[in-house]
């Protein structure tokens, strides 16, 4: 199983939020130290989120993101505040491997199609963040009327092959992922690569996701709190 330890950036620091609430910040750490720690542990993939960018709707933490890129050879995917082709160009030029478009997929689906045409489907993913069955945008501060299934279908028709799916109610709660939602989406779209995000707190959660047909997952609070040791996660990844 492919694992993406997460580093969420707020004011240049690595933090964890609970259910995406900017007022519930915990675990403030040095993101460069965390990235090095993950690299030293052998992880080949990192998931970065610019929380300031998601809220401001434009890139904010570019300096620290660039420094993380410079210090690790890991595959890095990045989301948060990426709303223009120019912003995508900047991040891809500094060596970010894949960009995650979230709010833009809802507000400007043509932009997603343009990005894929320009950069390739392997460099662009779509983040689908759900709250009570509906897609949330703008750093999870706004909830649209679009369902996860509808957005996934629409984006797949525009050439998207990789999706990061988060159930906001599970995020940061350490109570297990919404395996049923993920399984339903994967079954409906078997050709899509779905990366699970939110709620993973035990190795058993990862086994459940594998059983549901999910072959990649983002690990946030679980690795940062030590709920799952990095050595055990690396063993799970193989």
Swiss-Prot record:
List the catalytic activities from the record. 1-(5-phospho-beta-D-ribosyl)-5-[(5-phospho-beta-D-ribosylamino)methylideneamino]imidazole-4-carboxamide = 5-[(5-phospho-1-deoxy-D-ribulos-1-ylimino)methylamino]-1-(5-phospho-beta-D-ribosyl)imidazole-4-carboxamide
The UniProt record lists the keyword RNA-binding:
no
Gene Ontology annotations of biological process type = L-histidine biosynthetic process; L-tryptophan biosynthetic process
* Family to which this protein belongs: Belongs to the HisA/HisF family.
Q: Which InterPro entries match?
A: Aldolase_TIM, His_biosynth, HisA_bact_arch, Isoase_HisA-like, Isoase_HisA-like_bact, RibuloseP-bd_barrel
The protein in question is named: 1-(5-phosphoribosyl)-5-[(5-phosphoribosylamino)methylideneamino] imidazole-4-carboxamide isomerase
Q: Name one GO molecular function term.
A: 1-(5-phosphoribosyl)-5-[(5-phosphoribosylamino)methylideneamino]imidazole-4-carboxamide isomerase activity
């Amino acid at each position: 199983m492919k694992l993406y330890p997460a580093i969420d950036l707020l004011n240049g620091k690595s933090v964890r939020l609970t259910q995406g609430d900017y007022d519930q910040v915990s675990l403030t750490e040095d993101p460069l130290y965390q990235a090095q720690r993950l690299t030293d542990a052998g992880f080949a993939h990192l998931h970065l989120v610019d929380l300031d960018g998601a809220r401001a709707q434009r890139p904010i933490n570019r300096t620290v993101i660039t420094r993380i890129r410079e210090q690790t050879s890991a595959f890095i995917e990045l989301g948060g505040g990426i709303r223009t082709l120019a912003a995508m160009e900047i991040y891809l030029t500094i060596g970010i491997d894949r960009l995650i478009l979230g709010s833009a997929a809802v507000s400007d689906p043509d932009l997603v199609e343009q990005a894929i045409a320009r950069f390739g489907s392997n460099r662009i993913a779509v983040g689908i963040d759900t709250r009570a069955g509906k897609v949330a945008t703008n750093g999870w501060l706004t909830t649209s009327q679009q369902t996860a299934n509808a957005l996934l279908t629409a984006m797949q028709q525009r050439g998207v092959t990789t999706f990061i799916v988060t159930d906001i109610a599970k995020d940061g709660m350490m109570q297990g992922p919404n395996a049923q939602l993920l399984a339903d989406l994967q079954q409906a779209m078997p050709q899509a690569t779905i990366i699970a995000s939110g709620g993973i707190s035990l190795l058993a959660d990862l086994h459940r996701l594998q059983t549901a047909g999910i072959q990649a997952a983002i690990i946030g609070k679980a690795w940062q709190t030590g709920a799952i040791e990095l050595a055990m996660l690396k063993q799970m990844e193989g």
